[in-house]
Amino acid sequence: MLLEARTYALYLAIATKIGHANAQTGPVPVVGMTAGIDQVTGKLPLRMNIETLEQEGGPMWDLLIRGLDALQNKPEDDQRSHFAIAGIHGMPYAPYNGVGPVPGGSGGGYCPHQSPQLIPWHRAFLALYEQTLGDEAQRLALEYTDNDASAYREASQKLRLPYWDWASDPTLPPSTTQENITVNGPEGEINLHNPLYSYRWQTYPLNETQFPGHGEIGPETTRQGGGNDMTKFIKDSVYRTFSSTTTWDEMASMAGSGSSFESPHNAIHNSVGGSFLSLDLTSFDTLFMLHHCNLDRLSAIWTASHHDTLQVQPFTSQGLYSTAKGEIITADSPLKPFYQADGRTFHTGRTVATTEAFGYTYPDILGGDQGRKEVIAQINRLYRGLSTTEDWAAASTSRREWFVEIEVDRADLPLPCNIDVYLGDRFAGRTSLLSMPKTGIAYDELSLSRAVKSLDVHDNEPGGTERRLMNDLHVRVTKGGTTLDPRDIPSLHINVVGEEVTPPSSESEFPSYSNRTTATVIYVPTLHVARADTDD
């Protein structure tokens, strides 16, 4: 619904007042980190796994922690502070780079979710944070002298944000769970509040004008746990997206049918809980940067294995802070509020299509001479778990695999929430929906393979396995500690899908899928009744 003119005028006045300090200094162009790139070979510095970076320690680790600490302690009205950059995502709904709200906007943050812009928008967002962190690291490196000087200067040039590979292990990295941390300063060890653990609000209690409805939260960002109970389901979801999607639009967003990286990304948000549950607050937790670096990484690996970098189909926006509801989004639509180097032209999906645009890469995609086959082999090693000849031989027989398709209108749900799928009492997978957008059809696809295996289903009668699955399948829709009856959600549609899966002939190939069948689940009181259809 479009904002009424009077409401919009009042909202604009409040937002302009809040964002006035930021607007005074002029736009901050998003160029990423330009330092540390080999001027001869063009080799790019790596965004590293946070656990690898911590284990290696040394100057880069020291500068990461000290740099993040410096950003968190910058004044809130500094455009280059942690507070100001994190605030672009959700609250305090204030203009950044002078880019204000528009009539027909959502009244929320700038960030798109359930949209093909999800990944490119966050790529620009992370690049802004990374270049600001790099500036702090290079400043801090100058404090080190004597034998340490050159090592810290070199590390400051190559420092990039690390990622948390929740697709391999969704438990919180150890370095993010300790409240205090010790690193090496120019004159010895320094004990700090760990910036990877939480962000402490400088103004507390929170300003109700900036954070309406959040005045009662604690003095720092919080978490409730991690995804340690979802390791296999998340890995399956990620691998299914790598191996079955063929276009950017499918891979990037839950706005279309099939699996996507947005789904496990959402599951991590909801499982971590605390501040991570709220799209208004989540980006203030530095863990958010690590989380989204991994989403960016997965998309970059997908691009390297599929040679596809751009949104294909136009998408109708549900409305954002500076984007009107109904606006048609393409790969050339602006990623507000992120300007290119000229400070006047917005980035688009096209200008941020590669990691090279912002001066970094990932260990999984080392360069142009690394072919698609090597990237696929790495995907298979990391996420399918088949890394030896014996493993591949054991998986060489074609078989029928089973999936659940989920479709639901977000407007029918109390967001954020989870839709958990079970076979009998065996957890099979989860579709997680975040608090925004409030409307729009969400799609997901979850693997039933592990749950089917645990049920020891070996029914050779035609259609027998499918009927067994339909009888045993049920879902739970939960928000916090409350469970909803699926029959009270009229738009919720559940399909059981079967596909013939032919394993790859080598580790450098994906499996192929064929002979797809679909059975629609209809909820009648406590029974599950199926009507079987076959897709063309």
What are the language-model segments listed below?
Residues 1-30:
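Fungal secretory targeting signals
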Residues 22-536:
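C-terminal accessory segments of proteins
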